[in-house]
């Protein structure tokens, strides 16, 4: 499945993002994986800042079945009361419930947090079902957002869902870069330039004895 989104001068979206550009997305389904590829093209005459993020939803199983998350991040971004990153990085060991380097029960988490995963794999373990869901990214995806919507308002809908979002930059990267944060992950494309990358969601059978 392929799709393309374009912004041109005069478009409504151009008022919010004043660069002529295009985003192509390709979804490639195989026997045990879904690959999501992007291609961004700057069709403008000026350099264009941008970032890419994927926002998949995952349901918590019913009953006693658990989903465990392993996220290889040593640091996360401090946030304002509005949950926007300040640009300050903190060790995950300084905040309870933020060190996810070992498999952790998702239902026990309460997060809307940007972690620095630096292109490393993130894993969801469905031990009762006998498999892992491994999220692999190209090196441009520097961050992962964990959002436990099931205890942040969404529980009123009757759905118990959470997100693990792969992002090439931290949330609000354009404003943070304007404020002087040089390593927000924001990418800048020269006129006529292109950038591509992607995320793969891959099912792997769990090895015997792993829980």
Where do the protein language model's features map onto the residues?
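Active-site/ligand-binding surface loops and adjacent short beta/alpha elements
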Residues: 47, 60-140
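Acidic/His-leaning functional-site neighborhoods
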Residues: 105-182
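Histidine-centered catalytic micro-motifs
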Residues: 51-59
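Asparagine-centered strand-capping/turn motif at beta-strand->loop junctions
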Residues: 38-44
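Extended, loop-rich substrate-binding clefts of extracytoplasmic carbohydrate-active enzymes
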Residues: 1-31
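Short Pro-Gly-centered flexible turn/kink motifs
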Residues: 38, 187-205
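Beta-strand-rich interaction surfaces with strong enrichment in secreted/lumenal proteins
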Residues: 24-26, 184-189
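Short, acidic/polar linear motifs in exposed loop/turn regions
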Residues: 44-45, 205
């Amino acid at each position: 499945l392929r799709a393309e989104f374009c912004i041109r001068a005069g478009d409504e979206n151009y008022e919010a993002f004043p660069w002529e550009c295009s985003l192509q997305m390709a979804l490639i389904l195989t026997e045990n994986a879904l690959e999501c590829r992007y291609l961004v093209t700057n069709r403008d005459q000026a350099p264009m800042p941008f970032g890419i993020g994927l926002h998949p939803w995952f349901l918590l199983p019913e009953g006693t079945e658990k989903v465990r998350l392993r996220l290889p991040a040593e640091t996360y971004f401090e946030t304002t009361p509005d949950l926007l990153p300040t640009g300050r990085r903190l060790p995950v060991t300084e905040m309870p419930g933020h060190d996810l380097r070992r498999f952790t029960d998702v239902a026990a988490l309460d997060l809307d947090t940007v972690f620095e995963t630096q292109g490393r794999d993130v894993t969801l373990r469905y031990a009762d079902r006998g498999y892992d869901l491994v999220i692999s990214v190209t090196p441009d995806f520097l961050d992962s957002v964990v959002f436990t919507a099931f205890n942040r308002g969404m529980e009123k809908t009757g759905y118990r869902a959470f997100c693990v979002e792969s992002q090439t930059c931290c949330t609000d990267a354009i404003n943070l870069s304007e404020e002087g944060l040089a390593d927000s992950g924001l990418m800048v494309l020269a006129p006529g330039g292109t950038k591509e990358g992607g995320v793969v969601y891959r099912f792997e059978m769990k090895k015997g004895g792993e829980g």
